[in-house]
Amino acid sequence: MSILSFLLGEKKKSASVAKERLQIILAHERTGHSAPADYLPALQRELVAVISKYVKIGDQDLRVSLERQDNLEVLEVKIEIPQN
């Protein structure tokens, strides 16, 4: 971030904010201190809101799931994007 951006109060892009939130959630999950997948509904709503700014999708067009096997966690996001 440049000094000009800081002084003028330029806002971050919503995609970078969403990316930062995902990184925080994943880092928090790796420490093992959070409840299992309590954040998934909120994450799904936020992702729909961000993606809807660029592509017309509904709540049912995006699915978020978290799978755990041994020491591996997979956060899967499926998005159905209309062809038009």
Curated annotation (Swiss-Prot):
Q: Where are the transmembrane segments?
A: none
SUPFAM superfamilies found in the cross-reference section: Cell division protein MinE topological specificity domain (SSF55229)
Name its GO BP terms in alphabetical order: cell division; regulation of division septum assembly
Q: Which InterPro entries match?
A: MinE, MinE_sf
State the similarity comment: Belongs to the MinE family.
**Classification via NCBIfam families:** minE, PRK00296.1, PRK13989.1
Q: What is the name of the protein in this document?
A: Cell division topological specificity factor
Organism in which the protein naturally occurs: Cupriavidus necator (strain ATCC 17699 / DSM 428 / KCTC 22496 / NCIMB 10442 / H16 / Stanier 337)
Gene of this entry = minE
